[in-house]
């Protein structure tokens, strides 16, 4: 059976896959995102930035796979960032940065970009390298000052792309989205479906129920 490896520590991505019938092996990549971002061409389009980060994560994990997975598996790497007002925004990393981000994006709309990289590995060899970037437009509401304070104090927005989650407390402050909701959570099911088919597999080959 072809195993699925998720090259991410994201609980959101893991939840999306599990709800869709796939219980992946989770192996977190050792990629230093800040270092990689600093080395990228500053003129790269935002979609290419998240795609390169996703590919780096997938390749990093593929290089460390145990033999039982190298025999037959699919590795999925992802990276999400919010593109708003001409700027790519990743994880705030601190309460102060999360608050500043919410104060600037309240009442605005941006695009949640998720780069996807999918590696098909068979017999210890990478036979397919597929990738694409999903984009979903997110319209943010205008939370009150005390709501922003309590949201930041919850800790949720500090370590997630764009300082919000659609399927958590942050969902209260999203007015609407245009596009794929699973992409906002961090892994686009329709996009991964397309990538899997490019490798010659059917997504149903990967289901575990």
Swiss-Prot record:
Highest taxon of source: Bacteria
Substrates-to-products reaction catalysed: a ribonucleoside 5'-triphosphate + H2O = a ribonucleoside 5'-phosphate + diphosphate + H(+); a 2'-deoxyribonucleoside 5'-triphosphate + H2O = a 2'-deoxyribonucleoside 5'-phosphate + diphosphate + H(+)
Broadest EC class assigned to this enzyme: hydrolase
Cellular component annotations (GO), alphabetically ordered: cytoplasm
Main location: cytoplasm
Cell location: Cytoplasm
Active site positions, chain numbering: 79
Cofactor(s) for this UniProt protein: a divalent metal cation
CDD domains on file: Maf
GO biological process: nucleotide metabolic process
InterPro entries: ITPase-like_fam (IPR029001), Maf-like (IPR003697)
GO MF annotation list: nucleoside triphosphate diphosphatase activity
Entry's EC annotation: 3.6.1.9
Functional summary from the UniProt entry: Nucleoside triphosphate pyrophosphatase. May have a dual role in cell division arrest and in preventing the incorporation of modified nucleotides into cellular nucleic acids.
Family, as annotated: Belongs to the Maf family.
Protein name: Nucleoside triphosphate pyrophosphatase
């Amino acid at each position: 059976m072809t195993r699925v490896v998720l090259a991410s520590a994201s609980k959101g991505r893991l939840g999306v896959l599990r709800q869709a019938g796939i219980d992946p092996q989770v192996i977190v990549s050792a990629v230093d995102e800040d270092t990689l971002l600093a080395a990228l061409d500053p003129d790269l389009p935002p979609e290419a930035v998240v795609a390169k980060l996703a590919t780096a994560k997938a390749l990093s994990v593929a290089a460390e796979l145990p033999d039982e997975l190298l025999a037959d598996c699919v590795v999925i790497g992802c990276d999400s960032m919010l593109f708003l007002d001409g700027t790519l925004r990743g994880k705030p990393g601190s309460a102060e940065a999360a608050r500043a981000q919410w104060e600037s994006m309240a009442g605005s709309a941006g695009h949640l970009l998720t780069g996807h990289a999918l590696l098909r590995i068979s017999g210890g060899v990478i036979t397919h390298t597929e990738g694409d970037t999903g984009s979903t437009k997110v319209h943010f509401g205008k939370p009150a000052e005390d709501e922003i304070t309590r949201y930041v104090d919850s800790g949720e927005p500090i370590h997630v792309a764009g300082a919000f989650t659609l399927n958590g407390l942050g969902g209260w402050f999203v007015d609407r989205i245009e596009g794929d909701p699973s992409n906002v959570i961090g892994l686009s099911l329709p996009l991964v479906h397309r990538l899997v088919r490019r490798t010659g597999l059917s997504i149903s080959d990967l289901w575990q129920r």
